[in-house]
């Protein structure tokens, strides 16, 4: 299928099958399609609404163009689509560090800030991590520590061919959905936060086509009417759980896990330096209850999808114990010591 045929089909409201979408996205990644046609394609997809087969095909194409690090041990990722407008601190990044302290292997995929003041790369860099490690050094570090950050521009170099169009458009497009689906390590266990309740089931169907093992795709809401691409300690969380090919959808509340309900204002973040300080406060056991609850909620889910614990509740308890025993801070300090000694 040519880009011209795809555009005409989209104008008629047609859905691209996954192979057609994969072909078009591959041409985009290869720099073979003009910026104006890329823009038209993205806008028409957005206007009609992206479908499961299209998201799957696009993700396949991008992964096929990515540099894939070989990371053994079935690592997990905690990642969100962004776009919730909540401006919280980096909850999923903090949770990934605490889950690692619990014994979970982590391949955290991320980038600098796009829709918020501080992206996962920004806050980790502010904490002292080297974020832009090449493939070889990433693989070696993972063997030693079981925790790595996969900086998107390093592993997805072909994305540079669409970056100017995305920036100039200034609209949410299919690429805003794809970030959590294109971890270059091809993680099979994930916590994915999405900006729309409708996306939880769609993402589960996409991940099932990728033969993912155990994933929680979730959308949080607040009692004040806001939304979160995180599990919510401020209201309900809608979850589509994919486990060994089966999807079930349900709703949970903080109280289901012994957590208090908090105001979203208590989770607000700032720039990279401020968010790094917030994470250190949590690790030092000086974080306000709301912040600690938000982090252990996600970390507990990470323990659950990694099958380190048989339930989310037990994962939450394990994550909180890691903080209160000092094990989480010690784990992060050991990681930072490794990063300080890296020679690239």
Swiss-Prot record:
Annotated keywords: Amino-acid biosynthesis, Aromatic amino acid biosynthesis, Glycosyltransferase, Magnesium, Metal-binding, Transferase, Tryptophan biosynthesis
Gene Ontology molecular function, alphabetical: anthranilate phosphoribosyltransferase activity; magnesium ion binding
Pfam families: Glycos_trans_3N, Glycos_transf_3
Cofactor note: Binds 2 magnesium ions per monomer.
E.C. number(s) listed in UniProt: 2.4.2.18
Binding site for anthranilate 1: 80, 111
Catalyzed chemical reaction(s): N-(5-phospho-beta-D-ribosyl)anthranilate + diphosphate = 5-phospho-alpha-D-ribose 1-diphosphate + anthranilate
Binding-site positions, 5-phospho-alpha-D-ribose 1-diphosphate: 80, 83-84, 88, 90-93, 108-116, 120
Chain residues that bind Mg(2+) 2: 229-230
Binding site residues for Mg(2+) 1: 92, 230
Protein origin, superkingdom: Bacteria
Entries under HAMAP family matching the protein: TrpD
Name of the protein in its database record: Anthranilate phosphoribosyltransferase
This protein's encoding gene: trpD
């Amino acid at each position: 299928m040519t880009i011209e045929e795809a555009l005409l089909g989209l104008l008629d409201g047609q859905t691209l099958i996954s192979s057609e979408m994969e072909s078009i996205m591959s041409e985009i990644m290869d720099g073979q399609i003009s910026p104006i046609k890329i823009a038209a394609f993205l806008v028409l997809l957005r206007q009609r609404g992206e479908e499961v087969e299209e998201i799957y095909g696009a993700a396949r194409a991008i992964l096929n163009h990515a540099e894939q690090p070989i990371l053994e041990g079935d690592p997990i990722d905690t990642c969100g689509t962004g776009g919730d407008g909540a401006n919280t601190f980096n909850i999923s990044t903090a949770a990934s560090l605490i889950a690692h302290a619990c014994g979970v292997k982590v391949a955290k995929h991320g980038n600098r800030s796009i829709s918020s003041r501080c992206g996962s790369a920004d806050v980790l860099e502010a904490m002292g991590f080297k974020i832009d490690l090449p493939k070889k050094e990433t693989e070696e570090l993972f063997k030693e520590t079981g925790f790595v950050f996969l900086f998107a521009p390093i592993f997805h170099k072909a994305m540079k061919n669409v970056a100017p169009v995305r920036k100039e458009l200034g609209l949410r497009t299919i690429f805003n959905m794809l970030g959590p689906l294109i971890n270059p390590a091809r993680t099979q266990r994930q916590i994915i936060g999405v900006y729309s309740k409708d996306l939880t089931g769609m993402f589960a169907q996409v991940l099932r086509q990728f033969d993912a093992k155990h994933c929680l795709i979730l959308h949080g809401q607040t009692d004040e009417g806001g939304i979160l691409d995180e599990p919510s300690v401020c209201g309900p969380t809608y979850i589509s759980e994919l486990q060994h090919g089966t999807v079930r959808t349900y709703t949970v509340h903080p109280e289901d896990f012994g957590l208090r309900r908090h105001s979203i204002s208590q989770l607000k973040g700032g720039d990279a330096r401020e968010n790094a300080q917030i994470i250190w406060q949590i690790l030092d056991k000086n974080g306000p209850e709301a912040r600690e609850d938000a982090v252990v909620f996600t970390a507990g889910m990470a323990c659950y999808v990694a099958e380190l614990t048989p339930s989310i509740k037990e994962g939450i308890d394990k994550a909180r114990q890691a903080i209160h025993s000092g094990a989480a801070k010690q784990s992060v300090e050991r990681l930072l010591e490794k990063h300080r000694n890296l020679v690239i």
